[in-house]
Amino acid sequence: MLFRSTAPYSQAVKVGNTVYLAGVCGDDPKTDKIVGNGDIKIETKYALENLKNTVEAAGGTLKDIVKVNVFVKDIKMMADFNEVYSSYFPENPPARIAMQITDLAGGANLEIDAVAVL
């Protein structure tokens, strides 16, 4: 299930064989609420499932993702984030940056955006 934003942006934009995926958080697309009560592993799993659903809706898979940007409220969360992330990208993971930011919408602890080449 894809998240339906009320904000003026697309979840994904396809240009040729490149897909630009908008940022996703660890929210349940059925309720639009952040999950996990602060548990970064649960929130990461939901965010990556949301990313997976979006890239699949665009005709790709997680293996097509070539670049990921990760935004976290606390860089110390990255060890737990990486544990979950590695299960989604076990071999040849995409290029990636991770950065700490001050705040995210809806009380999220992380947001992930990506670029895929189909």
Range-by-range predicted roles:
Residues 1-118:
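Short, polar/acidic, helix-capping and beta-turn segments at strand->helix junctions
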